[in-house]
Structures are given as C-alpha cells and as structure tokens.
C-alpha cells in the first residue's frame, strides 16, 4: 500500500452509552491514538463536562498502536475502502487493594464466593475472607503445597483440595465459622511432587499432574463415612454397614494417564470429557477423561509452566520458560494451532489465567516480578503491567471479572 494523506473511516462501539452518529469521516492517515481519542471525546461532548474519557481503538480486531497509515500498511488494508474503527473505554490499571502476608512462598491461590485459599511453601493451606482476615491455617502436608482448588462451598461447609511435594493430595472439609478444617481423604499414588490439580465441571472428579510424568484421575466426592474409595469408586461393605466415621482415609486413583516423558507441570479440565496437560517435555496433550486415550498432542519448543483454558473462546493459553505466552486453537483444521504469541515478559511465564467474563482478556505472572493483563488483540503491548511484587510471581488468578490475585516468592498474596 502506497502512502496516502487522507483515509475514509467510520467509528463504531459496542458500548451504547458512547455511540456516535454512523457517519464516515475523512481523516489524515498520519494520526494515531491521541488524536482519535480527542476526536471521539469532541463528538461526545465529553471534553466540556470535566475530564475526557480515555479510549482504545481497534481496526479489524487489532489494537491500533501506531498511526492509521502504518497500521493499514502492516495489515495490507486497502486505502480505497472505508476503514472501520472500533473504540472502547480504557479502564484504569488495577491497583493493589490488599496484601496478605505469608510465612513462605505463595505457590497457588483459588477463590470461591467470598473465600480465598492459598498454598504455601510453609507446608500449609490458609483460608482468607475478602477483607484479608485469615480464617484458618491448615496443616498436614509434610512438604511445600504446590496447588489448591475449591471443590464446593455453601453456608455450612467448604471442600477443597491441596497437592504437595510430599506426593499426596488432601481432600479437606472446612466447617465454616469454626476456624478448623479436617482432612477427609489423602489421595496417594504419585511417586513425586504433585504440582497441579483441576476439578471437573460437575465437581465430582479431579485430575492431578506430577513430576512422576503421569496424570491421575480421582473422585472428588466426600464420603460421609470417611471411608476409603479405591479404583472401583466404592466403600467397603464393613464401612457401609457400621457407618463408622474414619478421618483421613487413603484414596487411590481411578485412572492413570501416561504419555509425557518429563514432569507434568499443569493440568486443566476443558470440558466434561476432555483433560489437557502440559509438561517439561515441551508438549501439551489432550486426553479423553473416560478412556484415558491421548487424543491430541501439541508440540512446543520450551518447558511449559502452566496452561489455561477459556470456555468463552475455546482456546488454550500457555506460559513458558522462553518468556512467551502462546495462544492455541486445538480445533484448527489448517494446522496452524498457534494463533498468537504475546511478548513482553522478561522471565519465565509461571502462570496464566483467562478472564471469566471477557474472551479477549488474559492475566499472566512471571519470574520478572510482574503481573500483566492482556487483550489478546494486542499481542505486543499488554493493557497493564502490575509491579507490586518484590520477587518472582508464582501464580495469578481472577477472583472476579475485575479483580485479580497473585502470589509469589516475596511471601505475599496481592489482591488487585
């Protein structure tokens, strides 16, 4: 595309309160974000009623980072056409709202309703409320806790999982208001550290990934008798008839998935029948949760630290040791399964988490001490870089559509 002085543009937005007339404009091709922002504010009359509104702009679903002309040349957009420019309000960067101090590194975090659980290298799980008060500190593991996950929570009790370098997963039951949580089942079967756990959509089963190179499938159902549940998923006859409650009974896996050749670093339940795993063997694998068959393998070039799946866009995101975040579409029929690469981190990308309400929004955590929030339509520039941590960030999760949680080796969980 040759350089042009003027372009025809039409503005539109999906935010009804900021709609303007559907009228084409003839604009200089050399204007960028700032001039467009002034133009939209002028058309809305916002500049006359206090502080102007900040907007972002997209052309063909890609963020405008430069002038209109440079964007059109890069994307090979014809100068003869009317350029459709979408604008949307730019929200201010999230700010730290609270800091929850731990005794050791914070490896993992999970939120359910108004309660947060964290896993730490002090071998403990802690339960917190939204205001940052510690409701319970749960001991039991003999090595650092690597992952935590809520199973369920109601007015009376909460059930959650914790996995550890001690090779076990504990199914815990918390009596709300008592400050106490008891271990109902200890899940044993892995022979090395259990680094990742994920619950299925119906909260009846969960999977685990370990440094022993395997995934295992387990029952997440808490037996009232506290009895041992094994491969057949049933209680012993004696336990059924006597009704004797036995705490912390051993639970064995329902199934073992083999195929990874190095440590399994991350597992996620994609839907009712599909589990996804990633590992240090540079592979992402999709498994049939019923049969244990490895349905598909996606190959990368570096160690995978964590994967996340979005039901909104049906895509996977991966964080890797090469500092990059990759977006994967396992359904791609053209063979191009990598749909995008997000570049900005300066260290290992240790954790990734999709927004629960926005199919384009992704959070990432890195050993470079930062948390970043991305719109996947802007692969080279994150929306925000959050710099509250003083050391490596090990985990990040959305607690709601507009709130984040991150934990790291500075012994802090930061709520944004």
Swiss-Prot record:
PROSITE patterns: WD_REPEATS_1, WD_REPEATS_2, WD_REPEATS_REGION. WD repeats lie at residues 101-138, 140-184, 189-228, 259-297, 299-338, 344-384, 388-416. GO terms for cellular component: nucleolus; nucleoplasm. The keyword Protein biosynthesis does not apply. SUPFAM superfamilies: WD40 repeat-like. It is found in: Nucleus, Nucleolus; Nucleus, Nucleoplasm. Belongs to the WD repeat WDR12/YTM1 family. Required for maturation of ribosomal RNAs and formation of the large ribosomal subunit. This is Ribosome biogenesis protein WDR12 homolog. It comes from Nematostella vectensis (Starlet sea anemone). The lineage of its organism: Eukaryota, Metazoa, Cnidaria, Anthozoa, Hexacorallia.
């Amino acid at each position: 595309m040759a350089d042009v002085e003027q372009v025809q543009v039409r503005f539109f937005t999906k935010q009804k309160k900021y709609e303007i007339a559907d009228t084409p404009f003839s604009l200089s091709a050399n204007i960028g974000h700032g001039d467009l922002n002034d133009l939209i504010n002028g058309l809305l009359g916002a500049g006359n009623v206090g502080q102007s509104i900040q907007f972002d702009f997209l052309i063909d679903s890609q963020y405008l980072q430069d002038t209109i002309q440079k964007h059109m040349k890069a994307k090979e957009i014809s100068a003869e056409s009317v350029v459709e420019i979408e604008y949307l309000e730019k929200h201010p960067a999230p700010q730290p709202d609270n800091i929850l101090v731990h005794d050791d590194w914070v490896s993992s975090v999970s939120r359910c309703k108004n309660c947060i659980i964290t896993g730490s290298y002090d071998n403990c799980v802690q339960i917190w409320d939204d205001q940052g008060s510690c409701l319970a500190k749960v001991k039991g593991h003999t090595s650092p806790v690597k992952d935590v996950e809520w199973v369920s929570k109601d007015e009376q009790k909460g059930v959650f999982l914790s996995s550890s370098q001690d090779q076990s997963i504990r199914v815990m039951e918390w009596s709300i208001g008592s400050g106490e949580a008891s271990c109902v089942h200890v899940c044993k079967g892995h022979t090395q550290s259990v680094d990742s756990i994920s619950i299925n959509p119906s909260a009846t089963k969960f999977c685990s990934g370990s440094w022993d190179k395997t995934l295992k499938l387990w029952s997440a159902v808490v037996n009232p008798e506290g009895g041992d549940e094994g491969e057949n998923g049933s209680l012993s006859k004696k336990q059924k008839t006597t009704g004797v409650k036995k705490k912390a009974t051993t639970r064995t896996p329902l199934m073992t998935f083999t195929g990874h050749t190095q440590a399994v670093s991350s597992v996620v339940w994609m839907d009712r029948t599909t589990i996804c795993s990633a590992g240090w063997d540079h592979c992402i694998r999709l498994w049939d949760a019923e049969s244990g068959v490895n349905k598909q393998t996606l190959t990368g070039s570096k160690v995978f630290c964590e994967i996340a799946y979005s039901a909104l866009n049906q895509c996977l995101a991966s964080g890797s040791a090469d500092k990059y975040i990759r977006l994967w579409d396992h359904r791609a029929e053209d063979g191009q399964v990598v749909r995008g690469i997000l570049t900005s981190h300066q260290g290992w990308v240790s954790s990734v988490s999709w927004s629960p309400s926005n199919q384009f929004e992704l959070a990432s955590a890195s050993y470079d001490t930062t948390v970043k929030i991305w719109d996947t339509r802007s692969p080279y520039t994150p929306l925000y870089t959050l710099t509250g941590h003083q050391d490596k960030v090990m985990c990040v999760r959305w607690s709601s559509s507009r709130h984040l949680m991150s934990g790291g080796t500075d012994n802090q969980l930061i709520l944004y």
